[in-house]
Amino acid sequence: MIFDGISAFRASGFTPQVCITGAGPAGITIARELAASGISVALFEAGGLEFNDQSQDFYKGTVKGDPYFGLDVTRLRFLGGSSNHWAGWCRVLDAVDFEAKPHVPDSGWPIKRTDLEPFLDKVHDMLELISFKPDKPISDDIRWVQLIKSPAVRFGEKFREEISKSGKIALVLNTYVTDLVGDGKRVSSARLWSNGGDGGEIAAPAFVVATGGLENSRLLLWSNQKTANGVVPEPAALGRYWMEHPQFEGGDAILFDTSMFEHDAVGEAFFSPSAEAIGERKLLNFGIRLIEQPYPGLKAMIADLACKAPETAEWVATGLGQHLRCAAQLYVGGEQSPGFDNHVALHPSDKDAAGVPRIQLNWKKGELERHTLLEGLKLFGETLVKNNLGRVRIEEWVASGQDYPIDQELAGHHHMGGTRMGDDPKKSVVDRDCKVHGMDNLYIGGSSVFTTSGQCNPTTSIVALALRLGDHLTTVLKV
């Protein structure tokens, strides 16, 4: 069932067992899992069926620290959430990402990758993925890895008809959950703002917050402020340990032999470090994206010459007025260390149209990120040399420790942390079942629960964790 606004929903008489706020990949996945087990779900989407500027304005905010995107540019506020601009790259977090590392403070999840594996077949079905090939070591330190370019499923489009026909899911559009009401043990209700006005409150036995890697923190921070920590009773880590995937063009590669690794359909290949290399070199996880540069005609001859006689190639290119790269560009996207000071906060004065404080994001890259960028490129270069596969040229700004360029991608638009998973309430917000510490009936879905970020795009892992949470809630609510 689909309703436009809370009034139409109330007129239906639908009674939910679970209220989910946010109809993106996590929220829709959890709702479908619960409905399949006969559990009734009210699924609240703050936006409508399509993009509109008025709704998107609610996502404006400010950023302090390193250059970053506008907060209303890096996510979307309508049915399907940020899947509506997802590029479609898929890979689940690596096993090493879940492990504690002595050189990475506050690393280590309370679960393992094996806890997600029972749900991966469903993930593949939902995201329309082919089977992943196993990682292929090209040295002790570097392995070829597969990222699959999926059809970039738009969750709102794909599941809209199924939801509209469901007797167990009530999707309520244009209805913004502004805050939750709790007493430090249970959430009793959610306050709503619907179609431009006060929507009252709605009660349910259980609540799931799944509004994204920024909004989850915002909603809970505002709820806590209004209820004297009645929603997150142990708030030390709330909004904290926020992470992105910094990514930059770090250099070029001249390739002699590519037979040891595979390219995808658009001439790209992906590499990441072994678990042993991460520990020995004291690195964060990282991914190198190798993009072949196809040159037609005369340019191809010069590019080929660059592999054999770079000085001659440079002279020829200069004489022809050509600025040629080597045979491949190297983009490095990396894990970010979970830092307490990187956090989502409420702006002290700026509010949205519903009166909710906007986000003030505090975000900086640290020394471990810079170390990983340089050492990762060195490690990849060493691997090419040892195996006579090619050579790497590292960009001068990377090699000499200059400032990060501001005219590149900056980051992956991947919002992780803020309500991270852990066993210690002083350093986490949810437990291994994604339940908020100290609360009986409040759960969180999405990448905000990531303890660490790994190096790969988060959507595949978001869906796997959402399926796991749906399975857990089914067990809890069926008792």
Feature map (PLM): residue ranges:
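N-terminal Rossmann-like FAD-binding beta1-loop-alpha1 element of flavoenzymes
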Residues: 16-43
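A glycine-rich dinucleotide-binding beta-alpha-beta segment and adjacent secondary-structure elements
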Residues: 170-183, 325-336, 341, 359-363, ...
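Residue-level detector of alpha-helix initiation sites
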Residues: 24-25, 214, 367, 449
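Conserved redox-cofactor binding core of oxidoreductases
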Residues: 102-189, 406-411
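Glycine-rich loop(s) and the adjacent beta-strand/alpha-helix scaffold that form part
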Residues: 36, 49-50, 193-265, 446, ...
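Extreme N-terminal leader/targeting segments of oxidoreductases
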Residues: 1-18, 36-37, 467, 475-479
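Redox-cofactor-proximal catalytic regions of oxidoreductases
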Residues: 61-132, 337-340, 344-348, 352
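FAD cofactor-binding and catalytic pocket of flavoenzymes
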Residues: 235-241, 245-359, 364-371, 412-415, ...
